């Protein structure tokens, strides 16, 4: 996994040249947006437990057979494994968002995930649906579109840097889409 700074150095080194003005301008922009990026990651990690449990609950509500005898969320140990997997996926998405690079997600989370789920008999459609629900929740937290009306008793207002976060919302959404594509 290379962060934005390391990528610039590696690229310049491969060309046997100094870091160029275009790279420096891109790094300045990256630093300027740094607080928003940190706030976005904080919004995900501070709400990770709720994001994951709500996603698994939503997946089960749409497919109640998952919690019946023989279902992939029955008995409790399988439910715990499902919640654990959701937390791991969300954690690697937060790493990718922090670094601004999907390689950590690809290398350490998605590589072989589909094959593992197939071997374990995990229904790909249900797993992808849970990730889609996590995507909706996480992007709402990042974009501050989560409101008291939507969250009810679970609503929690986060202190965040002011400004447009639409680029970070789109970036985070792309990481969730990578996971969905890898599973499906």
Curated annotation (Swiss-Prot):
GO cellular component, one term: phycobilisome
Mod. after translation: Contains three covalently linked bilin chromophores.
UniProt membrane topology term: Peripheral membrane protein
Protein location: Cellular thylakoid membrane
Entries under InterPro entries matching the protein: Globin-like_sf, Phycobilisome_asu/bsu, Phycobilisome_asu/bsu_sf
Modified-residue entries (N4-methylasparagine), positions: 72
Sorted UniProt keywords: Antenna complex, Bile pigment, Chromophore, Electron transport, Membrane, Methylation, Photosynthesis, Phycobilisome, Thylakoid, Transport
Binding-site residues, (2R,3E)-phycoerythrobilin 3: 165
Residues binding (2R,3E)-phycoerythrobilin 2: 82
Entry binding sites for (2R,3E)-phycoerythrobilin 1: 50, 61
Gene3D superfamilies: Phycocyanins (1.10.490.20)
A family per Pfam: Phycobilisome
Biological process (GO), any one: photosynthesis
Top-rank taxon: Bacteria
Entry function: Light-harvesting photosynthetic bile pigment-protein from the phycobiliprotein complex.
Family, per entry: Belongs to the phycobiliprotein family.
Subunit field text: Heterodimer of an alpha and a beta chain.
Protein name per UniProt: C-phycoerythrin class 1 subunit beta
Organism: Synechococcus sp. (strain WH7803)
